[in-house]
């Protein structure tokens, strides 16, 4: 939703239904056993941002994502295990230099610093800090 004051609110919801019997190719797997989709059944996302919240050149963005716990089964390549159940919050502030058509941004991904995996037996993902400089002739 784009509000009259410039605030933008967006949400996203993903639902994955496990339909039928999904059987992974594994020589040692018991015949007839089923595995999950290796994806969370429910995922949620909420974003709030305002590119010109203060003084018409200072903005912010906050995004929260939640992934429900799920059973990850990729025994052939990565293994099996429980993933998800993590809340990630990303934040960003921005500053527009109107005279130079430049947008400066600084932010933190995974503000809470809770390490998480997107696959089993892989390195965990932590926080990322970033600074960007965008030049665009349309920034005024």
Can you annotate each of these PLM segments?
Residues 1-72:
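Gram-negative outer-membrane beta-barrel transporters
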């Amino acid at each position: 939703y784009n509000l009259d004051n410039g605030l933008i609110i967006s949400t996203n919801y993903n639902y994955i239904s496990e339909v039928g019997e999904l059987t992974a190719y594994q020589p040692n797997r018991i015949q007839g056993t089923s595995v999950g989709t290796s994806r969370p059944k429910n995922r949620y996302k909420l974003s709030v941002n305002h590119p010109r919240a203060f003084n018409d050149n200072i903005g912010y963005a906050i995004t929260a994502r939640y992934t429900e716990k799920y059973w990850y089964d990729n025994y052939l390549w990565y293994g099996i295990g429980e993933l998800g159940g993590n809340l990630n919050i990303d934040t960003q502030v921005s500053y527009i230099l109107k005279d130079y058509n430049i947008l400066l941004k600084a932010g933190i991904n995974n503000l809470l610093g809770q390490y998480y995996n997107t696959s089993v037996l892989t390195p965990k993902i932590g926080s990322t800090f970033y600074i960007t400089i965008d030049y665009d002739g349309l920034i005024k």
